[in-house]
Amino acid sequence: MNITRYISKAVLASSAFCSIAAVSIGTLTSCDDFLDVKSETVAKENELFETKEGFQDALTGCYELMSSQNAYGKNMSFYMVDALANYWDMNLPMGGSENADISEITLFDYESDDSRQLIENTYLQMYKTILQANIILKNLQTNGHVIGNSQLRNMIEAECYAIRAYCHFDILRVFGQVPQNATKTVSLAYNESTSIDEMPPFYKYDEFVAKLKADLDKAEKIMKEYDPVYNHTFYETFPNTTNSVSLSEEYLYYRRMRLNYWAVRATQARLALYTGDNATAHSLAVEIINAKSDNGESIVQLSDLKPSLDNGKTVIYPSLPSENIFSLSVFNLLTYTNTYFPLEKIQRSSLVISDAQYNKLYEGQVTASHNRYSYWWRRCTTNQSAVGRVLTKYYWNTNSDTGLAPNAYNNLFIPMIRLSEIYLMAIETTTDLAEANSLYNTYMRYHNVLLDADAFASLNDVKNVIIDEYRRELIGEGQMFYVYKRLCSPSILWHSTNVSEADYVVKLPLTK
């Protein structure tokens, strides 16, 4: 399989009928118009699922929907959700940021026209993705026999359950109530239907979480039997490498780029931690860290973020592809990350942190060797010579900043789950001080920081350090807001006022 062709594939016919179903209804003027669109949608659907390739294209379409700018390609990663975490300095660009939507989001203003539009676009895209996964699941029941390979058929089913759960979980983390001691309750739609003319049922928090667990359990059970990466390393599931395994279907390669067994386990760990089940979160995190292939190699390893030789070129991959448990390919990533993270002059569209923020972020760290400090940031100026720091996580080579690196996979993606986060989860949830110190020692060693002594004298020390580590590690990935929210933290670094419970509950859009 050609990796460049694979990750740059346009949204296919499946996405087209899903788009008609999910968003065009609002523009219809009569019942006849609606029925015409519905008939066209059904026709496209029936045609698509007549072949194995149609199912594959539909699933690829799900990931395309997830990787769009209205979902994880921007809003659910470095833009809207990281603005909720108050990472970006909205005042540093000359004249102030032109990103009015997230300027308001940073203040937890969910009522302005700009922020409401951003929220609505994101909400719709997430449910559009879920709807497409449901359509695939429905057609697997009625027409799955056209997929002769049972491993492929089962993996398509499992990935759809995983996609549905993954998207619903982040809807919960953005729009749902705080998970502990909530005084403001919120019911959310958990959509298991393919209907485009009926509102899905809404569920209370505990019911919604039960739905999430059920879908993740279904995905895990199937993937444990059929996913190649269950007993092979991620590297082995890339074709044409020295250790590539032989798989029955080309579509089963590149497991890191789609929801897989270990990504499901990691999502289960995230859910357990979010809902306060620290023991389960710890058990799952340690399981992932210790996971071995049939030949005894680690399924996934931490990245040391060092320059490496790739097809004859010395390159740096700041997004740490080798430790990604799940990532989304975004073939046009640099066409818009250049807008938000410019490597020369800071513009009004730029997402930046100030020098003061930068120093606070790495306060107390061994910055002389810390590889995130060295490779994730670039010092830039505005037209008025104000200084800020630009995140370089989504650039392929911070040494040259020019030309594509040889391996397209290593630079055209958004990290969704990384092993570094799993380490931090294990450190946060352990009740064994020695284990906390051992895990943290390993974690910091891969940051090129060698500790002379144990970092923690008590488990209380862990609590004091871990939030800073999450904040440093997860910037640009849309995860830090969820850390603050599950703790219902009364303060967020760089937010000037106390944060209330209501601030953590993004207002549901009015759209249907």
PLM regions and their residue ranges:
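Inward-facing hydrophobic residues that define packing positions of alpha-helical scaffold repeats
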Residues: 59, 130-133, 209, 216, ...
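Elongated scaffold/linker segments in the mid-to-C-terminal portions of large proteins
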Residues: 117, 207, 225, 259, ...
